[in-house]
């Protein structure tokens, strides 16, 4: 007979078996069903009785020697031998999910899900369940009603998706009942409050997708069955276990139907149906698969449990019955949250010290008596006593102090305050003031009642002769510092003094250190030379140069006649250091409204129009009216002769003047008229203010400079003006040429 898939609802019996009663509520609450009470005590099961090895692993109890090993309390009392492809302490890690042959009556096929332990069992006829471990029950022969829904949806596409065939519903059909096993752990999940996600668009019925539904996530410990509790309004549902992708997409592709067990008030998903990690389920109310209405989307997250010891029996309580086995979404395992006053990994120890019964900062030590013990011991700090260290010890109650001493009790004991003349921890001994030899440095001790007196040796003083006599207290050194030396002293004299008491002063002038008839004046630890006026230096050894400290500026020289130096200034400067420039313009040397420009050792006059000379004293006269009258009365032919003669004479004079000047004269220039001098010196026509230029002309004789030309030049005659209103030279005569 050919095999079939465990989740395919194609067989007419599967919809009946898949109808599940479910209460649609939320908020998981956990609880445990009580184990059946045996009539007689059962023998303690072995470490492998609970079948701890998964995925076909073989459990082997450890030997007694291994169990007595110091680390045995932290390790299981058994070992698992895992088949090929499976690893882990409990054979919980499956590299190939089909390597352990999880399908009892069918073939295993690895799922395309991203989870490494996902597989799909294709069951043989007559079996179903997650691992094809459940035989199909017999089919009832009566009580069936015809469904009003269509017989089948659209044709199944070639994607190997399971067919969704509407079942015939039978109200009286019941699921297999649940019979609790001894020691079986069950968590009850109620559906009073759930997160409703209405109308989630996941697809349509033709692609075997569904939409909407209640979205619930619940966490359970490993090896624990889940009881889904229902209320009066719940309906039987069809439950499918799907992959993570199918769960997100509300798709039944790669899913399989599961058959929970009917229990009083709900449905039970056995622990064999749940693998470590998330387990995703999609449930439908009655025949809602045909209508694509999801009634429930459930995620059961199975986590490893650390709530019972590894060597515990199947009927051992989680967290020793003194705590709650709980987890958080951020945690990977279930662990114990102990009740008040219980501690330990499994809440196995009653902590009698948790409430801090010991007083006065005493240390509490809990007696290791497991859960039934409530004994503890208080270790009191010094000074306290009592079962809870609540009382302070009075060490003076027995009056330990003698001879009238006062007893003072403290946390560390008692102290006796002795009367004068007694000593000891209890003031039991009489004081001998000289017994301890209080007098030092060979001093003699004398008893004086309860006191003593010391007679000191020479050189020592003080109540116990411990101090040297301070010989320097009377300041015996006149000009020095006193230093105690043993039983005497020594004077360290200041510079310039000597003697036993530093009372004598040295006279440094006895060596005649001053030169050149200087006077020596004795000082303390030194001398001073008073020099004559012309000498200086520490010993008056240097002759004074009066010009050494005088600085004459602007070319001035120092005259060192006598004891004083005097600056002889260059022309144009004055002052003690020749630092004052004489302003020659103060005397107004420029005539006829000429402008004076002060210069070092001189001045320059800028003359107005019609005046020339060093001081603008030469007047240039132009007689145009007289010449015009003479020319008018003169005959025309004579006029032409005169004009021609004058032109020839002018040209000859000009040639002679230029040649003479170019041969023998060098013209220097200064101030703002330098361009005019340069043109005249280079034998070019004059094109500048000649009146200002002529005032500064100098001449040279045979290449040597002479005095200013204004002292040698004769008056100048002008005959005509140029078009730009500047005169033309006709004759310049000089002396001594």
Swiss-Prot record:
N-glycosylated. Residues 26-640 are extracellular. Specifically expressed in brain neurons (at protein level). Keywords: Activator, Calcium, Cell membrane, Developmental protein, Differentiation, Disulfide bond, EGF-like domain, Glycoprotein, Membrane, Notch signaling pathway, Phosphoprotein, Receptor, Repeat, Signal, Transmembrane, Transmembrane helix. InterPro entries: DNER_C, EGF-like_Ca-bd_dom, EGF-like_dom, EGF-type_Asp/Asn_hydroxyl_site, EGF_Ca-bd_CS, Growth_fac_rcpt_cys_sf, Notch_Cell-Fate_Det. GO terms for biological process: central nervous system development; glial cell differentiation; Notch receptor processing; Notch signaling pathway; skeletal muscle fiber development. It is found in: Cell membrane. Pfam families: DNER_C, EGF. The keyword Disulfide bond applies. SUPFAM superfamilies: EGF/Laminin (SSF57196), Growth factor receptor domain (SSF57184). Residues 1-25 form the signal peptide. It comes from the Eukaryota. Gene3D superfamilies: Laminin. Interacts with AP1G1. Interacts with NOTCH1. This is Delta and Notch-like epidermal growth factor-related receptor. It comes from Mus musculus (Mouse). The lineage of its organism: Eukaryota, Metazoa, Chordata, Craniata, Vertebrata.
